[in-house]
């Protein structure tokens, strides 16, 4: 009998924290499957999920205010360990008989907590030991309220000068609460704390590994698809590439990929996709050269949102036209990943985390009367990358910087023209090439060039040149929700600028974008 990699599972209830997905990713990194659900998850569904432990995540509300979110009573009736983080600790305290109040001294950012209670959760975990033997942890705080009275059967776990009950525990029931965030990297021992809860206290086994995920996905694809044929839109991005590799391994020639070349790709990207999948792996790939169709449809349009819609509609038209030439296709594969399928405004109350769901190829499944196969729908992006390596995809492909679905169409400000796309492609290639040479490519999270439809005077040799302006953009981020502009060395920027201006006749000036997110976004459009 095949191993059930979902057998040991953790339930995470979301109260609206920006860090909730990070908790889920940390649990998965430990090697244990988990799911993220809104705080008002149906009680029957909680029992049916049968978790080996529950994590109550943080949130922006105040427990002592009317109609603030509460944890379903079923969680406390399951008889499994419960770990409350920030708001999760506060609602646990309130619901089990304690008290939460607003605090005049709010804690946001780094803090040191003293570990004052001996519990299974923090036993042997510390950053400091004082001369008097007191254990301390360096943590990340983000709270305005605090627990002022614990439930009767709890003990103080940790404290700070402004928050005497910064952690509480009941070892007998395996209930734990901390006011800090163990899921963020700023809490140095956060990974060990979560591992202690998930592996030791909940008793989970580390069944969720890339090799086992690959085996499970391949078995599920074969069971779902049988002998039917599958169609996949291959973009060359990480998600669709991993889906292609996974499907090819599972069903071989039953898979046909359509690669739509829209004329808005990176330099040599089309050739690289064909070489990797068609030539090296033997995947059936149809390349649809549709540059003229995309550029004609985009002609005269400068509005970013309208450009995105035109590109999306044109993709569907081209993909549909190519798929109509194929016989006996029953399934459409998509590179949908877990953040895509977390319900939009998932809580019945509308107070939980809101993430827009999406379909990678619009309404195609309905229009073409195809059934969907989505082998990555349980995985976060970092898990998709690790799965790609497990399947033998090259590191540089799997860890390539993100590229927007509309491609260069949203990196050319205003109207898209072939001339602009050709110039931008070459400039972007130079930037990425120099980042790799200087060993900076994997130090930044995303880097690209933006084409600005304005001209600037330059001097080349004895002559003046009136040509286009481009901007370099490089950012560092963990989650892409916030990002800092990358502090690249001046020498590197000088090399990139010099090469672009000297090698590309149509560009006379190079600028560097020093805007962080927020207030700016990472992409310009």
Curated annotation (Swiss-Prot):
The protein's matches in InterPro entries, at most eight in alphabetical order, are given as: Class_I_gatase-like, GATASE, GMP_synth_C, GMP_synth_GATase, GMP_synthase, GMPS_ATP_PPase_dom, NAD/GMP_synthase, Rossmann-like_a/b/a_fold
Domain of life of the source: Bacteria
- State the reactions this protein catalyses: XMP + L-glutamine + ATP + H2O = GMP + L-glutamate + AMP + diphosphate + 2 H(+)
Q: Enumerate the SUPFAM superfamilies for this protein.
A: Adenine nucleotide alpha hydrolases-like (SSF52402), Class I glutamine amidotransferase-like (SSF52317), GMP synthetase C-terminal dimerisation domain (SSF54810)
Q: Where is the GMPS ATP-PPase domain?
A: 208-400
| Residues binding ATP | 235-241
Any single Gene Ontology cellular-component annotation: cytosol
Q: Which residues form the signal peptide?
A: none
Keywords, sorted A to Z: ATP-binding, Glutamine amidotransferase, GMP biosynthesis, Ligase, Nucleotide-binding, Purine biosynthesis
Would the keyword Ligase be found if you checked this record's keyword annotation?
Answer: yes
Q: Which residues form the active site?
A: 86, 181, 183
Q: Recorded E.C. number(s)? A: 6.3.5.2
Recorded GO MF terms: ATP binding; GMP synthase activity
UniProt xrefs under Pfam families: GATase, GMP_synt_C, NAD_synthase
Query: Boundaries of each Glutamine amidotransferase type-1 domain copy?
Result: 9-207
Q: What does the record give as its pathway? A: Purine metabolism; GMP biosynthesis; GMP from XMP (L-Gln route): step 1/1
The function of this protein is: Catalyzes the synthesis of GMP from XMP.
- What do we know about how this protein assembles, alone or with others? Homodimer.
**Name of this chain's protein:** GMP synthase [glutamine-hydrolyzing]
Annotated organism of origin: Pseudomonas fluorescens (strain Pf0-1)
Gene name, Swiss-Prot/TrEMBL: guaA
